[in-house]
Amino acid sequence: MLICLTAIGGAQASSYIENGQAGDPASWRSSEFNAEWGLGAIHADQAYAAGYTGKGIKLGIFDQPVYAKHPEFAGENKVINLVTEGIREYTDPYIPVKKGDAFRYDGTPSVDSDGTLGSHGTHVGGIAAGSRDGGAMHGVAFNAQIISAENGDPGPEDGIILGNDGAVYKAGWDALVASGARIINNSWGIGITEKFDEGGYDPAYPHFTVNDAQKQFDQIKQILGTKPGGAYQGAIDAARSGVVTIFAAGNDGNLNNPDAMAGLAYFVPEIAPNWLSVASLQDPTNTGDYSISTFSSRCGYTASFCVSAPGTRVYSSVIEGTSLENLTTGYAKYSGTSMAAPHVAGSVAVLMERFPYLSGAQVAEVLKTTATDMGAPGIDALYGWGMINLGKAINGPGMLVTEQDIPEEFLVNGAYGPTQFVVDLPGVGAVLDKGKPTERVCSDVLCGLDFWSNDISGHGGLTKQGIGTLVLTGNNTYAGPTLVNQGRLAINGSVTSDVSVQNGGIVGGSGTVGSLTARRGGTVAPGNSIGTLNVAGNVSFEPGSRYAVEVGPNGQSDRIQSSGSATIGGGEVAVTLENSSNLLTQSEVRSLLGQQYNILTAQQGVSGQFDAVAPNYLFLGTGLSYQPNGVTLSVGRNGTSFASVAQTANERAVAAAADALAAGNPVYESILNSGTAGEARQAFRQLSGQIHADIASALVNDSRYLREALNGRLRQAEGLASSSAIKADEDGAWAQLLGAWDHASGDANATGYQAST
């Protein structure tokens, strides 16, 4: 544990008005911000100005208890102190406890081996997530919730493996994981023996190496899975569960490597993606520049999962006194990698809010790959990846890491996860980590749409999953493939890798890609509305793929522009109006009549054709023409003639005559806009004149009914059909109802008709 250099009291403001403004980092640099120099060093103000403060994130502190009643943690449930209990496994020579004793921790401050109340956890908690409320200082993730579990460790760290009581630590690990904490900060370790401490900074003396750490791990390995090994098994289990597990590198000087606790992921490589070790940096006001603290252990063999953060003279919350009766609260400056680690923990919390859809391992990769390089170029033995930089990290990863990106000196086989960085934007409202203690609803709009602006390098590849949209605006040189499996990937910057759109995926944007392949079910939709997607290499459309083209009335359209060749093996071209997701309506097609659009150009030539183009209506639609180096889309008359939908010779004659009329003729335009063949045939009948002959025929035919009625009445007068005699001196009346239904069949020459009287 570390030494308090100065203690300064402070009180929280009774009411607080936030003066920090969105988009203005300088507005966040209040006196409260400036009191903790580490915040400015890691560019936390840029994260705050972008709207990210760790809100909604549970941040675990495994240490001496964080004193929840300290005014730095004012507010409901700002600090949750977990209760752990059990039977001890170790007799500690520094405090009066022995193996077999019962223990119970509930957040009540405990007494250190020097007789004073343990303030270490409270100081660490303030750095990680102290509240921003106008008080003396605030932490990195000031809106995060602290979950505190006590490790019962009064110090010192003496290199004894069993000294970290297996029962006490395992209870704490299990409680923290069960609480839903996504991050666990550990500002403690095993330590190294006096053999190495005696050497100080003299290179002539022995110093702690990876081989010495291996000897420690050999002892640890023997007790994994047992009660005495709970401190180590618990750490492994936490990291395996997906919790980002952070360890201070140690305070043994720049010539010593971290102990096997901070370096546990080196020996258990599968947990390395969720593991971070942390070296300490000095306050530049004392040194003129950021550099490793003189007391800090180097990153050493942990370099590929190690970062550096402020750890010298860090101002944060403390408690003082020798008992609860004389406990007081205040603030003090402490130094140590114990102070560096919570800067990292708070930063991870901020990034978890920033990237709610990323796993803990992915957030850790973002933090590592955006660190400011220090010391020797790239990953080095002193600083690891370098000093964490929240201002850059909020813009996405800086590298997609595989083993090929790690210097051989620091390479740990099997420690870097999959070669594809899978970005799953599941959509707003999706449930994440279902069934785990960290289960949560992704309620942020970022789960549906996010922008990454960093330039991304590395040997890994990018896989887009989920229904949401990811937009890349940087100049990306990562070497692995870009796979769009679901949702939309918009490339507005550049990607030098090969881009492949799978079934259910959409690729778009107005940037440049290395090559482009659209597979069955995949869609290419250039632009962000209308725009051009540039391809440095070749383009390929496979059978069943789709090319979605937006067009505008001004002659502009989406376009693919390739410096290589274009191979079209089928698929469909679907045409929509600008800013619409639906195919062109008939009226929209009519409004674009005569327009032509260059939708694909390839300097090395175009081969093959698309299977279809949509939409197509009765007489209007879209069509494609192919040139040696391009494909042109035309909007206008399709190949369906007016006469082809006519049914009779009369209709065909009229249809052919109408088809020969010039565009703009009202008869031609009326037929052109017919929605169905039936509508067109009705127009042909009206124009053919057949109705006049049909009326004459019907009138002649129907006239017989009146004639027959009169003749029938005359026959009555002759007595031929009268049922009763009518006297000469009587009046009479005669009435008869007439009705008829006529039908005339048509033939190839003329249509039939129906009539009723």
Feature names for model-found ranges:
Residues 665-757:
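Outer membrane beta-barrel translocator domains of Type V secretion systems
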Residues 330, 337, 342-343, 350, ...:
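Extracellular repeat-rich scaffold modules on cell surfaces
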Residues 63, 84-100, 264-349, 353:
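Extracellular S/T/G-rich loop segment that most often corresponds to the catalytic His/Ser-adjacent loop
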Residues 16, 53-55, 116-119, 131-134, ...:
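Substrate-binding/access-modulating region of protease and related hydrolase catalytic domains
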Residues 36, 43, 174, 183-185, ...:
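C-terminal subdomain of the subtilisin-like protease fold in secreted/lumenal serine endopeptidases
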Residues 125-128, 149-154, 311-383:
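Hydrolase catalytic cores
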Residues 16-25, 35, 45-165, 179-182, ...:
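Subtilisin-like serine protease catalytic core
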Residues 506-595:
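Extracellular beta-strand/loop-rich repeat segments of large surface/secreted proteins
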